[in-house]
Each structure stands twice: as structure tokens, then as C-alpha cells.
Regions:
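Conserved residues at the C-terminal ends of beta-strands
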Residues: 5-6, 24, 237, 258
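Conserved C-terminal structural/oligomerization subdomain of aldehyde/semialdehyde dehydrogenase
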Residues: 56, 123-124, 133-134, 175, ...
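A structured beta-alpha segment of the ubiquitous adenosine-cofactor-binding alpha/beta core
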Residues: 1-20
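ALDH superfamily catalytic-core signature
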Residues: 17-20, 28-194, 257, 305-306
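Buried hydrophobic positions in well-ordered alpha/beta secondary-structure cores of metabolic enzymes
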Residues: 20-21, 51, 91, 102, ...
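Short, well-ordered alpha-helical microsegments
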Residues: 10, 30-31, 243
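Short helix-initiation/N-cap motifs at beta->coil->alpha
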Residues: 6-9, 51, 215-217
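Short catalytic-loop micro-motif centered on adjacent basic/acidic residues
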Residues: 1, 20-23, 56, 232-234
Length: 311
């Protein structure tokens, strides 16, 4: 059953006599759901929430692979995926070269309506024949989800522009078409640091990318882990040893090696750690989340028997 509504509707649903709540959304709402669930003895939760995911690029990888993978990871779906790489960590020996080329590639991305329409008098709104919608390949990504999300992206972009410690490589342009809100990419260079402006550690959820240098593998691990989130990280290196170390030390629920993003593999669990959530709502883990185990002992003897040591 689908029940549509906003906050009040959702709050009523989670207070019903249900055994398990599976939620995908913001960390703030997820935290509220877990508090409500804690008031019950039996209610459990699986929450997949926000992230500050990253792509980590070592200097032994091909530049073309690094660019292709990081562009896709950062800007697919307007950067509005929980696994989008809002941070790109690059080894210092290739940092300047990569940043320049990344900004150039990002500047070529077109944003706009993701569909083409066959207009006609079909009785549909605005005369659009919905069955004839086809992807518009000219545009790499579409709009920000709504005005609230659009204003959030603009807010963080403006913080970056006002910060003397951030070097802006590509400034965004904005446009509004009815209820569609568009932003071109924001790309900037900065050292990892304590930043009270929030844009380095908070989830922006839009085409907003910080390119951050690191020197050693230990630096990369420290920088990646230095947020409240722990959802996804991409490792780009030709060195299997480095990849395994990163896999073991990065605080993330999903790690991909030499790819553009997490693959939609039905047999793999999808979820994170820390503020990114609890539980992995996919694959076999889903069934374990919404069921409970029962220990069933069967006596096949003709008389009553007891476990060893019990009389």
C-alpha cells in the first residue's frame, strides 16, 4: 500500500504497531525514526541516510580512468545520490594536473531537461504525450529535486566562494524554469581542515565537488574517515595492496575499486555505518531485517529426552 504525505503522515506511520521500519532519507529524519522505535520493545529499524562519500585517486592510476570515474561519481543525477562523491581526494604529485583537467571536463557538462517530448493534443497536461518521452542525451544531468534543495546547494556554493582558503576552479550558474531548478557544477581546490562553514563535512546533495590533496595512504584514510558519515568510497589505484589497506581501514559500508560508482548488484548489501545509517536494506540482509529467527528443536525419540546435562 502506498500512503502519500509529508512529515505528519510519516510520523503517524512509524508509530503504528509495525515490527520494522525501513527508511531512506536524511540523517535527521532517520534519527527521529530510531528514537520513536526505541520507545517500543519490538520495533527495529533499517535506515540508509546521508553521506559525504569520496573518490580517492592515487598517482599510479591512469589519468583518463581517474577523470572518467570521478566525473561520473560526482555528477550523475546532479550529484543527488547518497553515494555521490562530493569529495575527491587526489595524491599530491598529480593534484594540480588532475584538478585542472577535472574542472575542464566538468565545464563541458550540460544541465537541462533530461527528456525530449512529443508534443500533441493527447489530453495530457500541457499537451504532452507521456508515452513518447525519450532521454535527452544532450544534457548530462537534470534539475535539483526542489526549491529547498536548490537553495541548500546555492548556500554551500556561496560559502565556498567567500572562503579565502578555497580556490574556485569552476563557478556555478543557476537557472529556474517553472518548478525546475538547475545548477551547473561547482568545483574547487582546498586542503582538508577544520572548517566551521560546514561545506567540507556536510552533505550538499548537488553538483558540488571539493578536490583535496593527500600525501600518503595514511593521510587518505584519515581524511576520508574524518566525517560523521560512512557510506561509500571509491579507490582508484593499480596497486592491489593499497586497495586492500583502504578497504580494511576506511569506515564505509560500500567500497568500490577502479570504478565510477557502486554497481547495482542485487546480491550485494547496500548501506553504511556511522551517521549514514544502520542495517543494509538490500540482498539477503533485507529478509533478515524483516523476519526473526526461531530455534526449533524436534524430539524423534519414543520417550521424553533432555539436552545433555539437564535432568
Amino acid at each position: 500500500n502506498l500512503v502519500h504525505g509529508e512529515g505528519e503522515t510519516g510520523d503517524a506511520l512509524i508509530r503504528e504497531d509495525v515490527d520494522h521500519i525501513c527508511f531512506t532519507g536524511s540523517a535527521e529524519v532517520g534519527q527521529h525514526i530510531r528514537k520513536v522505535a526505541a520507545e517500543s520493545w519490538h520495533k527495529t529499524t533499517s535506515c540508509e541516510m546521508g553521506s559525504k562519500s569520496a573518490c580517492i585517486i592515487f598517482d599510479d592510476v591512469e589519468m583518463s580512468l581517474a577523470l572518467e570515474a570521478s566525473i561520473a561519481s560526482a555528477f550523475k543525477l546532479s550529484g543527488q545520490r547518497c553515494v555521490s562523491s562530493g569529495r575527491i581526494l587526489v595524491q599530491r604529485s598529480i593534484y594540480d594536473e588532475f584538478a585542472e583537467k577535472f574542472a575542464l571536463e566538468a565545464s563541458k557538462l550540460k544541465t537541462g531537461d533530461p527528456f525530449k517530448y512529443n508534443l500533441g493534443s493527447s489530453g495530457c497536461p500541457d499537451g504532452i504525450v507521456w508515452e513518447s518521452l525519450i532521454p535527452n542525451e544532450e544534457n548530462y544531468y537534470g534539475p535539483i529535486i526542489n526549491e529547498q534543495g536548490f537553495n541548500k546547494v546555492k548556500h554551500y556554493n556561496e560559502l565556498v566562494a567567500s572562503d579565502p582558503k578555497a580556490e574556485v576552479l569552476l563557478s556555478p550558474a543557476y537557472s529556474v524554469n517553472g518548478k525546475s531548478f538547475y545548477s551547473t557544477p561547482m568545483v574547487y581546490k582546498t586542503e582538508w581542515r577544520d572548517c566551521d562553514m560546514g561545506y567540507l563535512r556536510n552533505e550538499v546533495f548537488g553538483p558540488h565537488v571539493a578536490i583535496i590533496p593527500f600525501d600518503t595512504i595514511d593521510d587518505a584514510i584519515r581524511i576520508y574517515n574524518d566525517t560523521e558519515y560512512g557510506l561509500a568510497v571509491g579507490i582508484l589505484t593499480n596497486d592491489f595492496r593499497k586497495a586492500r589497506i583502504m578497504r580494511d581501514e576506511c569506515e564505509a559500508g560500500m567500497i568500490y575499486w577502479n570504478g565510477g560508482s557502486i554497481a547495482a548488484e542485487s546480491h550485494l548489501a547496500f548501506g553504511g555505518v556511522k551517521k549514514s545509517g544502520n542495517g543494509f536494506p538490500s540482498a539477503a540482509r533485507t529478509f533478515r531485517a524483516v523476519t526473526h529467527e526461531v530455534s526449533w528443536t524436534v524430539n524423534h525419540a519414543d520417550k521424553l529426552t533432555f539436552p545433555q546435562g539437564m535432568k
